[in-house]
Regions:
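A generic structural signal for short hydrophobic patches within well-formed alpha-helices
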Residues: 9-10, 41-44, 118-119
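Short, well-structured N-terminal submotif of metal-dependent ribonuclease cores
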Residues: 1-36, 46-59, 130, 138-139
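Generic structural signal for small/hydrophobic residues in well-ordered secondary structure
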Residues: 5-6, 44, 78, 104
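Residue-level detector of structured alpha->beta connecting loops
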Residues: 31-32, 65, 108, 126
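A generic structural signal for well-ordered alpha-helical segments
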Residues: 27-28, 85, 104, 122
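Conserved glycosyltransferase catalytic-site signature
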Residues: 6, 38, 94-98
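Active-site neighborhoods of divalent-metal-dependent phosphate/nucleic-acid chemistry enzymes
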Residues: 66-114
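Acidic, PIN/NYN-like endoribonuclease modules and their adjacent C-terminal/linker elements
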Residues: 1, 101, 105-140
């Protein structure tokens, strides 16, 4: 299953034509194995420019498999991921990326992202990346 992170949904929503946008569009069109998690839903909905757009985005996201964020397991997992990344010389800019990574790791999901920071985190902790992009991940 491919866990699409916030940056992938933003690419899709803006129809950027990037490789990540095209990959997520393909997965959606073919009923591919796409999942979301609450931290991603939170970030995507927070970026909505209106209540109507928020409702549209919520309907879209909730069509896909939900990897529930487990507060007991995933908060601790995110803290361990953050610490491990720092020890490897990669300091994540935000804990939400570590929360998303913790969920992906627990479910053994592949991440689809255009976020350079989350890409580095995934590489440090050994999460598989769905890498359709020809362009480099965008800095956060």
């Amino acid at each position: 299953v491919i866990l699409a992170d916030t940056s992938a949904w933003v690419e899709y929503d803006r129809a950027t034509g990037s490789a990540v946008d095209l990959r997520l569009s393909e997965l959606i069109a073919t009923d591919g194995p796409v999942a979301v998690t609450e931290p991603v839903i939170m970030e995507v909905l927070a970026g909505a420019r209106s209540d109507a757009r928020e409702a549209d985005l919520r309907r879209l996201l909730l069509r896909f498999h939900l990897y529930r964020f487990d507060a007991v397991t995933d908060f601790e997992g995110a803290a361990r991921i953050h610490r491990r990344c720092r020890q490897a010389g990669v300091t994540p800019r935000g804990l939400v990326d570590c929360m998303i990574a913790a969920v992906a790791r627990r479910h053994q999901a592949t991440l689809l992202t255009r976020d350079a920071d989350l890409t580095r985190v995934a590489r440090v902790i050994g999460i598989d990346l769905d890498q359709p992009q020809q362009e480099p991940p965008q800095p956060t």
